[in-house]
Amino acid sequence: MSFSERLLAAWYRGHPALALLRPLEALYRRVVNARRADFLSGRKPAYRAPVPVVVVGNITVGGTGKTPMILWMVEHCRARGLRVGVISRGYGARPPHAPWRVRPEQDAAQAGDEPLMIVRRSGVPLMIDPDRPRALRALLAEEPLDLVLCDDGLQHYRLARDLELVLIDAARGLGNGRCLPAGPLREPRERLESVDALLYNGADEDPEDGFAFRLRPAALVNLQSGERRALGYFPAGQMLHAVAGIGNPQRFFGTLEALHWRPIPHAFPDHATYSATELTFDPPLPLLMTEKDAVKCRAFAAADWWYLAVDAVPSPAFVAWFDARLEHLLAR
């Protein structure tokens, strides 16, 4: 287990040594609170776009199902007749310049794994740049849009936003409730009182303070051929190698077990890069990975490599709430 994996486990399961990091946590809290106060007070300017901006973000370190939820929002907005675009930091991307328009034919090293996955799945106009306001200006210069979704960026206060949605893993919650580096929180938990909605990934029903959503396995897709198969293609009891380089790989492995398969888990760091050698395991079995990992492996995939396509399914209450908020934002 790597240091980052051990630290993540300590944040969510508890460890007495974390008390040694509380002085650094106090400093971190002061810095992030002061930075947010500067933008809220107007001492530092924030870019206000001519179209509504919806931030879909995290308050915790680690995966919460943000990318599938953005894909759901893209399709939902399109079904309402809206022209929607996405901006992203492009974590791990190395484009020739920034801002950079992500295209389906690009590779993950250039575009970033999550932006490339979003574009290949949906075809949505998407611009990456660590400077979110610059990404948004560039996207609007190329596309006539009604609405922009900001992938992550909850803490990027240089970009004014009209709606803030925060995703939380229902099983892990906020961990020990402490800020970095003593805990997994990017901002103090009080920050959640000011966001517009909390969405709990994996909750069985809507909690009192937010909405539930789940990730529904949809299909098996072959990396080499693009062939799409129903989940029943792998029978119950099928042994397979399971690869996950995401924020919470155990959620992926648990999903495979819930489908009555027998995964041999291979967890990698979030946003990991791969080679064919790294993904050659014994015994020889089908290999199943996340869609986010698949965009980095298609060029060297073997014939029995697959990814599990998943769809976000929000609760009916959230869909109704989101539609009402969209109607309000677009009427202004």
UniProtKB/Swiss-Prot annotation:
Task: Name the chemical reaction catalysed here.
Answer: a lipid A disaccharide + ATP = a lipid IVA + ADP + H(+)
Q: Which GO terms describe its biological process?
A: lipid A biosynthetic process; lipopolysaccharide core region biosynthetic process
Look at the named UniProt entry and state the broad enzyme category this protein falls under.
transferase
**What InterPro entries does UniProt report for this protein, alphabetically?**
LpxK, P-loop_NTPase
The pathway to which it is assigned is:
Glycolipid biosynthesis; lipid IV(A) biosynthesis; lipid IV(A) from (3R)-3-hydroxytetradecanoyl-[acyl-carrier-protein] and UDP-N-acetyl-alpha-D-glucosamine: step 6/6
Q: Name one GO molecular function term.
A: ATP binding
Please give the family membership noted in the entry.
Belongs to the LpxK family.
Q: Provide the function of this protein.
A: Transfers the gamma-phosphate of ATP to the 4'-position of a tetraacyldisaccharide 1-phosphate intermediate (termed DS-1-P) to form tetraacyldisaccharide 1,4'-bis-phosphate (lipid IVA).
Per its record, how is this protein called by name? Tetraacyldisaccharide 4'-kinase
Q: What is the lineage of its organism?
A: Bacteria, Pseudomonadati, Pseudomonadota, Gammaproteobacteria, Pseudomonadales
